[in-house]
């Protein structure tokens, strides 16, 4: 038991089992969500535009990060080391891809540039190159020990410091960059919208609702990284202050929210109107008519929704005529 407590930083074997189960379950959800976006990109040609290509790379990084979080086993040396390096590499790549999406949106909307597709090679060099560099630097502080269910975290003071500098420092740099960038984009669009309202007497309410929905969606993007890694950052700082004492509930929140990052990204970035439209069109082609009624309204093909509404209107008219005759 003493060996378990030492390796787990004060956690019991039961605590470690619970955290491991949470990590596996949350990582599996992220893997499925990210794999779904990757599959949609591969199957639907209409999604292979530059903007969604960046989302594809983000989902691919999340998928591989989630996969290695699942397969890591602290009881097996080689697999443990492999998980530590690959998880670090792909998790860093994931939040770096979010900065390229923010940069692309800012360059297009705020600076009115149309050359973003020419920057794809630079994006790859920036994301994969930076991820490789910080992963190699992290190996210098690797003391070949693990903490809890993850082979990714370190127990030694030097390992903790290097881990913080090579992951959490660039992570919060990306969060600050994304937040500032989306703030500028949203402010730019809102100012343009006010000018449009001032120049016209009538504004399409439907367009307004759609624009506000998009603006609100962009505002949530930086919150995904904050929600995924805030508890992990607090836990790492706590490890510095009290290295021999682990807080169980904080470890649960750390592992659970971090492992769900891929799922959050797949929903926010990937499951957009273009993806839903592509799915609707395939459902309309292959799904039998009798199964439409069992689908939620937002998943039904558009033509079927129109037909369903027309049928409802006709049935209401028939019932009204019947009442009038009576």
Curated annotation (Swiss-Prot):
It is found in: Cell membrane. The keyword Iron does not apply. One of its GO terms (molecular function) is G protein-coupled receptor activity. Keywords: Abscisic acid signaling pathway, Acetylation, Brassinosteroid signaling pathway, Cell cycle, Cell membrane, Cytokinin signaling pathway, Disulfide bond, G-protein coupled receptor, Gibberellin signaling pathway, Glycoprotein, Lipid metabolism, Membrane, Receptor, Transducer, Transmembrane, Transmembrane helix. The modification N-acetylserine is found at residue 2. InterPro entries: GCR1-cAMP_receptor, GPCR_2-like_7TM, GPCR_GCR1_put. Residues 45-51, 106-120, 182-213, 268-326 are cytoplasmic. It is a multi-pass membrane protein. Mostly present in the meristematic regions. Expressed at low levels in seedlings, vascular tissues of cotyledons, hypocotyl, and roots, stems, leaves, flowering buds and siliques. In dark-grown seedlings, localized in the cotyledons and the hook. SUPFAM superfamilies: Family A G protein-coupled receptor-like. Gene3D superfamilies: Rhodopsin 7-helix transmembrane proteins. PANTHER family: G PROTEIN-COUPLED RECEPTOR 157-RELATED (PTHR23112), TRANSMEMBRANE PROTEIN 116 (PTHR23112:SF0). Interacts with GPA1. Together with GPA1, may regulate the cell cycle via a signaling cascade that uses phosphatidylinositol-specific phospholipase C (PI-PLC) as an effector and inositol 1,4,5-trisphosphate(IP(3)) as a second messenger. Promotes PI-PLC activity and IP(3) accumulation. Involved in the blue light (BL) signaling. Together with GPA1 and ADT3, required for BL-mediated synthesis of phenylpyruvate and subsequently of phenylalanine (Phe), in etiolated seedlings. Probably involved in cytokinin signal transduction. This is G-protein coupled receptor 1. It comes from Arabidopsis thaliana (Mouse-ear cress). The lineage of its organism: Eukaryota, Viridiplantae, Streptophyta, Embryophyta, Tracheophyta.
């Amino acid at each position: 038991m003493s060996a378990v407590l030492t390796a787990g930083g004060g956690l019991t074997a039961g605590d470690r089992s619970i955290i491991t189960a949470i990590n596996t379950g949350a990582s599996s959800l992220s893997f499925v969500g990210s794999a779904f976006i990757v599959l949609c990109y591969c199957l639907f040609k209409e999604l292979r535009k530059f903007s969604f290509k960046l989302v594809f790379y983000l989902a691919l990084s999340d998928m591989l990060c989630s996969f290695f979080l699942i397969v890591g086993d602290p009881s097996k040396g080689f697999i443990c080391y492999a998980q530590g390096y690959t998880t670090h590499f792909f998790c860093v790549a994931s939040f770096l891809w979010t900065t390229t999406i923010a940069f692309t949106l800012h360059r297009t909307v705020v600076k009115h540039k149309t050359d973003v597709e020419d920057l794809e090679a630079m994006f790859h060099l920036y994301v994969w190159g930076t991820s490789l560099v910080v992963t190699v630097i992290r190996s210098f502080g690797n003391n070949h020990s693990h903490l809890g269910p993850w082979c990714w975290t370190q127990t030694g003071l030097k390992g903790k410091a290097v881990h913080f500098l090579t992951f959490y420092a660039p992570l919060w740099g990306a969060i600050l960059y994304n937040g500032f960038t989306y703030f500028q984009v949203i402010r730019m669009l809102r100012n343009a919208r006010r000018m449009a309202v001032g120049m016209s007497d009538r504004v399409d309410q439907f367009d307004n609702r759609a624009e506000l929905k998009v603006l609100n969606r962009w505002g949530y993007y930086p919150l995904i990284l904050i929600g995924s890694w805030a508890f992990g950052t607090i836990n790492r700082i706590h490890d510095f202050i009290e290295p021999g004492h682990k807080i169980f509930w904080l470890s649960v929140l750390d592992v659970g929210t971090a492992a769900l990052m891929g799922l959050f990204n797949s929903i926010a970035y990937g499951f957009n109107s273009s993806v839903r439209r592509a799915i609707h069109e395939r459902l309309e082609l292959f799904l039998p008519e009798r199964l439409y009624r069992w689908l939620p309204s937002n998943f039904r093909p558009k033509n079927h929704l129109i037909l369903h509404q027309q049928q409802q209107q006709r049935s209401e008219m028939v019932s009204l005529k019947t009442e009038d005759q009576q």
